[in-house]
Regions:
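Short, flexible loop segments at boundaries between secondary-structure elements
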Residues: 350, 420-427
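Active-site-proximal loop/hinge segments that shape catalytic or ion-binding/gating pockets
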Residues: 402
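Residue-level recognition of phosphate/Mg2+-coordinating polar/acidic sites
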Residues: 66
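Short functional linear segments
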Residues: 1-61, 70, 74-79, 125-128
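Flexible active-site lid/hinge loop adjacent to a nucleotide/diphosphate
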Residues: 133-212
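C-terminal helical cap/extension that packs against the catalytic core
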Residues: 213-235, 239-240, 251, 281-282, ...
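Nucleotide phosphate-binding/pyrophosphate-handling subdomain across enzymes
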Residues: 55, 152-157, 163-176, 180-184, ...
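N-terminal phosphate/diphosphate-binding loop that engages ATP/GTP or pyrophosphate donors
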Residues: 70-117
Length: 427
C-alpha cells in the first residue's frame, strides 16, 4: 500500500485544475488585470490569510529569486523567527514549495490544507473564474502559514510581478528585485525595459531593495517608487548579489550579524549547482535562461571539488531540456561556446508547462555548433542512462536547462519518498 496515496491524489487534483481553459492567465491574457482580480478574489474569499503576519516580503527578478528567498529564510530561522516561505516551482515534489523554518509542509498537512482550500477555489470559480495552478498553490501556502502562526512570510514571485498572484496579497511590507534579464519574453517582454516595468509592479507603499545596476532600468524602478511614495534601496555587491541582497534585507529587519552569517552558511537549495556525485562528477543546476546559464558557465570554469576543477581538460556532457517558448540558441551559447561538449537533448515530464521539442534543440546545435555531438531523447531517463554510459571518470556531467528536468533526475540520488518522509530535500 502506498503511504502517500492521499498526497498523490491531492496533487493530481490540483494539477488537473489546469485543464480548464481560463479567461485569463499570465501566459496569454489579453486583459492581465482580470488575472490579478481573480487572484485577489481568491485570497479575499479565504479571508486574506496572510494579513496576520508581522512582515510580508515578496521577491521578484529574472535570476536569483529562489536563492534570495532561501538565504533570507535561513537567516530569519537562525534568528529564532517563525518564517514561512513559498517557493516556485518545486523540483521533485509539491511539498518543496511550502516551508516553515527547517521543514516542508508534511504530506498529511498538505492534504488537509488542500481540503480547506477546495471550497474557496470552488467559490472563486463560481463567482469569477477557475484560479490558476500558481494561485491555488499560493493560497495553500498562505493557509498553512496562518495555521503555523508565522511571523514572517516570504513569497517568490512566479512570473513578472505587476500581474502575478503574489501581487494580490493584501499588503507587501518589503519588496526585492534581484535583477532584470531576458526570460519569459513572450509574457512580460519583449524588451528589458518592459520586463523591468512588470517587475516594478510589486513596489507599493513599502521599501524595495534591488541589486540591479543598469541605470535605464533603475530609472523605471525610481518612477514606480515616486508614484507609490516608497523607497528604493540599491544594494551594492562584489561577488554574490543574492547573498548581499538577503543580508541587506535582514539588517533592515534588525537581525544580528551572527545570524546573518550562519543563515548564509547553512542556506542551500536543491538543483542549484548541486553536486550529487563526485566521481565521475555530476552536477544538477536548474539554470533556465541566458543569464543563469552564463553564471553556470562561469561557476563551472572557476569551481573546484576536493582540489579538482569542475571542468578539467576533456569533454563536458550536458543533459538539456528547456521550457517553450525560449531562445534556445541564447541559452545554449554560454556552455557550447566555452566547452568541448556532448549534448543529450530531452524534455521534462510535467504536464503544466510546455517543453521544447528535443529535435528543435538538436537542430539549433547542428546549425550553430556543427562540431558538437547531440542526441535526442523523449525520455529524460534514457538520456541520463546514455550520458552515464558515455561518461568517463575524469569527465563532468551537468544536468541543466529546467528545474523540472533536474528535479526528475534528482530522484536517482534522493527519491520523492525520502523527501516526503524527512520533509527535507537533503539527507
Amino acid at each position: 500500500m502506498n503511504p502517500y496515496g492521499n498526497y498523490n491524489q491531492t496533487f493530481e487534483y490540483l494539477s488537473s485544475l489546469a485543464n480548464i481553459r481560463q479567461d485569463a492567465s499570465i501566459t496569454g491574457a489579453k486583459n492581465p488585470k482580470h488575472y490579478l482580480q481573480r487572484a485577489k478574489l481568491l485570497l479575499k474569499l479565504a479571508g486574506n490569510p496572510e494579513k496576520f503576519a508581522k512582515k510580508i516580503i515578496v521577491v521578484t527578478g529574472t535570476s536569483g529569486k529562489g536563492t534570495t528567498c532561501n538565504i533570507l529564510h535561513q537567516i530569519l530561522s537562525q534568528a529564532g523567527k517563525k518564517v514561512g516561505t513559498y517557493f516556485s516551482p518545486h523540483p521533485t515534489t509539491a511539498i518543496e514549495r511550502i516551508k516553515v523554518n527547517e521543514l516542508y509542509i508534511s504530506p498529511n498537512e498538505f492534504v488537509q490544507t488542500v481540503e480547506k482550500a477546495k471550497p474557496i477555489i470552488e467559490k472563486c470559480y463560481q463567482q469569477l473564474d477557475a484560479p490558476s495552478y500558481f494561485e491555488n498553490f499560493l493560497l495553500i501556502a498562505l493557509l498553512y502559514f496562518k495555521q503555523k502562526k508565522c511571523d514572517y512570510i516570504i513569497i517568490e514571485v512566479g512570473c513578472g510581478g505587476r500581474y502575478d498572484a503574489a501581487n494580490a496579497l493584501s499588503r507587501i511590507d518589503l519588496a526585492a528585485i534581484t535583477n532584470i534579464g531576458k526570460d519569459h519574453l513572450h509574457i512580460i517582454g519583449p524588451t528589458q525595459k518592459d520586463i523591468a516595468y512588470e517587475k516594478a509592479g510589486i513596489i507599493h507603499k513599502n521599501i524595495c531593495f534591488t541589486t540591479e545596476r543598469k541605470k535605464q532600468l533603475l530609472k523605471i524602478f525610481q518612477n514606480e517608487t515616486k508614484k507609490t511614495k516608497s523607497n528604493l534601496i540599491k544594494v551594492n555587491f562584489k561577488n554574490n548579489p543574492n547573498q548581499e541582497l538577503a543580508a541587506t534585507i535582514a539588517k533592515h529587519l534588525k537581525i544580528k550579524d551572527q545570524y546573518i552569517e550562519k543563515g548564509i552558511q547553512t542556506a542551500k537549495l536543491p538543483c542549484h549547482f548541486e553536486i550529487v556525485q563526485k566521481k565521475p562528477l555530476i552536477i544538477l543546476d536548474s539554470a533556465h535562461n541566458p543569464d543563469k546559464l552564463k553564471y553556470l558557465t562561469k561557476k563551472l570554469k572557476n569551481s573546484s571539488i576536493e582540489g579538482r576543477l569542475c571542468f578539467p581538460e576533456g569533454k563536458l556532457h550536458i543533459i538539456f531540456a528547456l521550457s517553450a517558448p525560449k531562445d534556445i540558441k541564447a541559452c545554449l551559447k554560454p556552455l557550447l561556446d566555452n566547452f568541448n561538449a556532448q549534448v543529450y537533448a530531452t524534455r521534462f515530464l510535467i504536464e503544466q508547462r510546455n517543453s521544447t521539442d528535443p529535435r528543435k534543440i538538436s537542430s539549433i546545435i547542428k546549425k550553430h555548433w556543427p562540431k558538437v555531438k547531440c542526441q535526442t531523447f523523449l525520455d529524460p531517463w534514457q538520456a541520463f542512462y546514455k550520458a552515464k554510459q558515455n561518461l568517463k571518470s575524469s569527465q563532468t556531467l551537468i544536468i541543466t536547462g529546467s528545474t523540472y528536468l533536474c528535479g526528475e533526475l534528482r530522484k536517482h540520488w534522493i527519491s520523492e519518498e525520502q523527501i516526503l518522509k524527512s520533509r527535507k530535500s537533503f539527507n
